[in-house]
Every structure is written in structure tokens, then in C-alpha cells.
Amino acid sequence: MKLTPKELDKLMLHYAGELAKKRKEKGIKLNYVEAVALISAHIMEEARAGKKTAAELMQEGRTLLKPDDVMDGVASMIHEVGIEAMFPDGTKLVTVHTPIEANGKLVPGELFLKNEDITINEGKKAVSVKVKNVGDRPVQIGSHFHFFEVNRCLDFDREKTFGKRLDIASGTAVRFEPGEEKSVELIDIGGNRRIFGFNALVDRQADNESKKIALHRAKERGFHGAKSDDNYVKTIKE
């Protein structure tokens, strides 16, 4: 018997669903994986039987488990369950939205935030730098990118930005369209300030000596706004 990877996945799902069903019958509260497997396996089997439509199974999928059938917090983790099931007229995606209703209990790890603004990077001194995109393509900079090493087509005082990042929320970014000029706020990078990667201009501890090396590298590689002593000679073993 030769099975495709998809067929093997469905067999594994069937086994997991049957195991979850037996545990439910024993009164064992199901975890996340077991709950998803039970719902998915049931839909897959009913679709194969060919007596119910996809729409009917979407509704039926919401009746298989109650809040008391699963561990605390599991219901809130499962926003939807989607399974590609084989019907008599072909494969269809059956999506069950909110398959388990919440029981009103607190969700493990849930956060309740105050109804007020959150101050980010509080207590950190910020510097303002004017930046212009002299290139012909948009450039987007993430919150924790070492600003000194951003795209070479961004023109600004690179020395002023050494060891700094954008003063914006984590995971967000600032975008510069071609020819656009605007000011950004920067703060010091935290931690032990060992900067590696990015455009490989530093790759060491961020101190005054490494700043000189980085400026020299940036100027040699054509990064706009990088100024260094033309007579500078590296004296630090890299």
C-alpha cells in the first residue's frame, strides 16, 4: 500500500481524533491538540460518508465539544478549525468558527490592560535626526534595526545614530518613499550593546573605537552620510 504525504497526514489525524474521542468518553479533559483533532476527524469522516453538506458540518462542528470537555484556556485558544475534507463531489474546505464556547473563566496568561495610553521606552533619552531617501525605491526600517547601518541610500548624520534604534513600538516600522525627507527619534540600543549582523559595519561591542571602524567601513562602502578621517588607519584587531 502506497500512501501520499497528504493521505498519511489524514491517517494520523484520524488516529489522534479517535484517541481524543476515547479520552473524552473517559471524562478526561482534552488539551488543544486533542480538541482540534476530535473536531477535524469527525468532520472528515462525516464528509466521507457523504450524507451532510459542508455548511451542515460547519454548524455541527460547533456542537461536538463543550467548555467542560476541555482544559481551562483551551476554548479561547481555538478561534477556528479548518479541514480539507473529501465529499462525494470533491474536496472542500470546512471551517468551523468558534468551535467551543468560552465558559466565562479567566484565560491562563490573559492580560487586562488599563484604559489609558502606554508610554514606550520611558526614561530613555531620544535624539532627533533628519533623514532623506536619495534612492529610487522605498525603504522601510524596523523598530530594532541598528539605525547606523540602514540602507545606504538613506542620507543622514550616521555618526549621530551609532548604537541607536528607532523610538517606536516593537514590531512597527518607519517607511521612507523615494525622495522623502523627515525626522525620526532614536534611542540607545539596550542590553550589553554588542551589535552583530545588519550590514556588518560593526560586528563587535558598540564603543568609541568600534564607531571609528564602522564609520570607515560605511564610507568605503558608499553609505550616504558616513564621514570619517581619510587618514584613519585601523589599529584594532578585528
Curated annotation (Swiss-Prot):
InterPro entries: Urease_beta-like, Urease_betasu_sf, Urease_gamma-beta_su, Urease_gamma/gamma-beta_su, Urease_gamma_sf, Urease_subunit. It catalyses: urea + 2 H2O + H(+) = hydrogencarbonate + 2 NH4(+). Gene3D superfamilies: Urease, beta subunit, Urease, gamma-like subunit. SUPFAM superfamilies: Urease, beta-subunit (SSF51278), Urease, gamma-subunit (SSF54111). It is found in: Cytoplasm. Induction: By nickel ions. Residues 1-102 are annotated as: Urease gamma. The keyword Iron-sulfur does not apply. Its main location: cytoplasm. GO terms for biological process: urea catabolic process. HAMAP family: Urease_beta (MF_01954), Urease_beta_gamma (MF_01955). The novel dodecameric structure of the enzyme may allow it to remain active at the cell surface at acidic gastric pH. Within this dodecameric structure the 12 active sites are clustered within the interior of the proteinaceous shell. This may allow a high local concentration of ammonia within the enzyme which may protect the nickel-chelating groups from protonation. This is Urease subunit alpha. It comes from Helicobacter pylori (strain ATCC 700392 / 26695) (Campylobacter pylori). The lineage of its organism: Bacteria, Pseudomonadati, Campylobacterota, Epsilonproteobacteria, Campylobacterales. The gene is ureA.
